[in-house]
């Protein structure tokens, strides 16, 4: 059963990526006949795939059936709150056609009641960790929420992770607004920098960490450019800082004046050099050269 649902999910994800929902209606009809459980929903992420099809499709029959499926699956997350509710749920199939959608929903619901509490606690961390962002009617804020959600859709990671990119975009915007309390230039620059970093093709890990909740929305809203940078850029900055410190130390300690080196810029031979052990002890020392005429610097091993 799980393999079949996973196969449906993969087909729908490909449809979304190719922006071609042909055949989606047949898949949705087959899904409707599968007795869904909370465990199956969580393990296959089929809900995210169906929701993505719903958003993209212009076919009213497809969107209507997708909405119906999502609505029925959401009932699995709620569960009856009392024993009385449970008894009522068990009695309802007796007065309902056995093959009707309602009967299948109730059958699935009653079959999973005993494990509901444990399964509810085991829901995806992302869904339960953060409260939903308050709604707003401010056109600037709404536009920023849309752009943040679009940035989170970069690379389609949100489909594989199963994140609600629209809600997450709203939470990030809400955190930014709560800190700045205005939609002025500071607010817009903050939003713009988040969007730029989320779309950065060289820094996909940042987007994935935000989508899966490793970086909470309120923390992401406050992160500096240095904190959002890719690991590669952080390493480059670290090396540049080390080299700047080394060159500063060289300038303070001086060096040995020589005419053995020719400056690549001014072609003069009035230079000062310093040798520093930058690698392991058995490796050659690095020679740093400064042209005393034009200030050009270079190094070699």
Curated annotation (Swiss-Prot):
Domain TFIIS central: start-end pairs: 140-256
Disordered: annotated span: 80-137
Any one GO cellular component localisation term in the record: transcription factor TFIID complex
Position(s), cross-link Glycyl lysine isopeptide (Lys-Gly) (interchain with G-Cter in ubiquitin): 55
Binding site for Zn(2+): 263, 266, 291, 294
Gene Ontology biological-process entries: erythrocyte differentiation; positive regulation of transcription by RNA polymerase II; transcription by RNA polymerase II; transcription elongation by RNA polymerase II
Keyword rRNA processing listed: no
Ranges of compositional bias, category Basic and acidic residues: 80-93
CDD domains named in the record: TFIIS_I, Zn-ribbon_TFIIS
Subcellular compartments: Nucleus
Domain TFIIS N-terminal: 3-80
Signal peptide: none
An example Gene Ontology molecular-function term: zinc ion binding
Zinc finger (TFIIS-type): 259-299
Residues that bear Phosphoserine: 57, 81, 97, 100
The organism's place on the tree of life at top rank: Eukaryota
Zinc-finger in keyword set: yes
InterPro entries to which the protein is assigned, alphabetical: TF_IIS-typ, TFIIS/CRSP70_N_sub, TFIIS/LEDGF_dom_sf, TFIIS_cen_dom, TFIIS_cen_dom_sf, TFIIS_N, TFSII, Znf_TFIIS
Keywords assigned: Acetylation, Chromosomal rearrangement, DNA-binding, Isopeptide bond, Metal-binding, Nucleus, Phosphoprotein, Transcription, Transcription regulation, Ubl conjugation, Zinc, Zinc-finger
NCBIfam families according to UniProt: TFSII
Quaternary structure and partners: Interacts with EAF2. Associates with UBR5 and forms a transcription regulatory complex made of CDK9, Pol II, UBR5 and TCEA1/TFIIS. Part of TBP-based Pol II pre-initiation complex (PIC), in which Pol II core assembles with general transcription factors and other specific initiation factors including GTF2E1, GTF2E2, GTF2F1, GTF2F2, TCEA1, ERCC2, ERCC3, GTF2H2, GTF2H3, GTF2H4, GTF2H5, GTF2A1, GTF2A2, GTF2B and TBP; this large multi-subunit PIC complex mediates DNA unwinding and targets Pol II core to the transcription start site where the first phosphodiester bond forms.
Comment field (misc): S-II binds to RNA-polymerase II in the absence of transcription.
Family affiliation: Belongs to the TFS-II family.
Function as written in the Swiss-Prot or TrEMBL entry: Necessary for efficient RNA polymerase II transcription elongation past template-encoded arresting sites. The arresting sites in DNA have the property of trapping a certain fraction of elongating RNA polymerases that pass through, resulting in locked ternary complexes. Cleavage of the nascent transcript by S-II allows the resumption of elongation from the new 3'-terminus.
Listed name of the protein: Transcription elongation factor A protein 1
Gene source species: Homo sapiens
Gene: TCEA1
